[in-house]
Amino acid sequence: MERFVVTAPPARNRSKTALYVTPLDRVTEFGGELHEDGGKLFCTSCNVVLNHVRKSAISDHLKSKTHTKRKAEFEEQNVRKKQRPLTASLQCNSTAQTEKVSVIQDFVKMCLEANIPLEKADHPAVRAFLSRHVKNGGSIPKSDQLRRAYLPDGYENENQLLNSQDC
C-alpha cells in the first residue's frame, strides 16, 4: 500500500539570496557608497555593516532617511577637511610676503629720506607705534637686519632713480 501513496514533491527551498556574491562585488556594483573591510560590507558614510548577500537590503539602506542624512553630514565634513591645493597656499603666502617686503622697503626709504638712523627702529616706543598704527608694522625687523637686507635694495633703487634723472 505504501507504493500507491502519492507524496507531494519536495518544496523547493529557493530563497532570494545570491549565494556567490562577495562584498567586493557589491562595492563595484554600488560604487563609492560602500567599502569592504575584513570580508564585511560597510556603508562609507554611515559606517554600518550591511548584508552583502541581499541586494534589496543594501538598496533599502541607501534609500533610507538616516543614510541620506548621514551622507550629507559626511560630505560636509569632507568639504571642511579637504586640503587646499599647494598653489593656492603659496599664492596666499606670496601676496603677504610681497606686502611685507613693500612695507619694510617703504619704512627704510622713509628713514633714509628723513635722516633717521635705523637703530631708532629698535626703540620700544617706535615698535609699539608701528605695531599699533601701521598695517604689518609689527613685521618690520630689527635694525641690523634692515641694514643687512633692505638698505642695499634702497641704495640701488635710489642710484637707478638718480641715474635716470641725470640722463
Swiss-Prot record:
Role of this protein: Binds to nonmethylated 5'-d(CGG)(n)-3' trinucleotide repeats in the FMR1 promoter. May play a role in regulating FMR1 promoter.
Gene: CGGBP1
Additional facts recorded: Binding is severely inhibited by complete or partial cytosine-specific DNA methylation of the binding motif.
GO BP field: epigenetic regulation of gene expression; negative regulation of transcription by RNA polymerase II; regulation of gene expression
Residues the record lists as Phosphoserine modifications: 56, 164
Tissue expression per record: Ubiquitous. Highly expressed in placenta, thymus, lymph nodes, cerebellum and cerebral cortex. Low expression in other regions of the brain.
InterPro entries: Cggbp1
Ribosomal protein is among the record's keywords: no
Motif Nuclear localization signal: where in chain: 80-84
Lineage of the species this protein comes from: Eukaryota, Metazoa, Chordata, Craniata, Vertebrata
Keyword Transcription regulation: yes
Subcellular location: Nucleus
Name used for this protein in its record: CGG triplet repeat-binding protein 1
Recorded GO MF terms: DNA-binding transcription factor binding; double-stranded DNA binding; identical protein binding
Sorted UniProt keywords: DNA-binding, Nucleus, Phosphoprotein, Transcription, Transcription regulation
GO-annotated cellular components: cytosol; nucleoplasm; nucleus
